[in-house]
Amino acid sequence: MTNFDEYIRQGEPQKREKGYAWQTAIGLQAVDGLKPSDYLIETARKDIEGEITIDEAEQLIRSYYQSKIAHTPEDVEIHEADMASTNIRRLLTEKTFAFTLVGLTSIHRRIFDGIFKFAGQIRDYNITKKEWVLRGDTVLYVSAPDIRKAIEYDLEQERQFDYSKVDRNGLVSHIVKFVSGLWQIHPFGEGNTRTTAVFTILYLRSMGFDVTNDLFANHSWYFRNALVRANYQNVQKGIMRTSEYLELFFRNLLLGENNELRNRYMVVNPPEELRAEQVQQIDRTSTEQPTEQVPEQVRVLLLTLSNEQLSLKGLMEKIGLKHRPTFVENYITPALEAGILKVLYPDKPNHPRQKYLLTAKGLALYNEIKSK
């Protein structure tokens, strides 16, 4: 995730505000495994420094993609990340907000203008989404004919809630319930989590909360997975809805706590090696050092692959990511460099049946985690 901390920490209010907005906007793309281009990062820095305006930044990004002759699938995804980041940056620095159905659909329209043809349009079809944290299962989202009424009901219930009658813990619990319920409606074909995040940030600001920290920027995938767990149950398998993970996120955001936010702790019916870690996680905070000193992405890759041999596409599907360059950069390359991962055909990197598997070192690390 791109780091604009140098601007956020320094004293100039305008640079700090724009630095936070860009960092959050870019970080939110991770909910769909997207990563912006280097050109977007360069353009963002110019905007933060005051060399260009946000209008000029947007025009530069549009022109950059219009000038491209060929467009690969990766280009389409990077274009989405660049445009959505630019649009979210603009939204987060505006001093306006409408706590209405129109306000919510307007946020979606403005984030995905020029990206999705259906930007700002409520879906007229039902959807399912395979979730890594649910091991391929899906949350049950609101049926298309009921979406408008569901949103209006949730917003009206929230308007009537009296925050003066709850303490800090009750406040966090209520915010969690509201945001979780709004997300479960999933009113759009794509982009629901990013829209919910921006709507939530603007709503919290309208109530006087200072949410200019790195939670949404650095933990957007956790935010999504926590929303999934808060809205999923399978009684037959003994899995109930739980808001505990989302509460940890919002306690960090609103109360300044330092709870540990780990995606792997949320996996339902986890394999043995993950189950042991989930037990150890209880009452731990992020000030504690994890047992294994490997990056979170490498750890997820290791535990996902285990004793299998999988193609790059197969690995991405199991983890729930779709942007190949980002996946290679953040997962595959670090694991290869750490000596944890290897390829089945090292002399033929482009072999049509190329697979990834753990090395002896990777298997030892996997077994060490499994034995805990």
Segments and roles (model prediction):
Residues 1-372:
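FIC/Doc superfamily catalytic core
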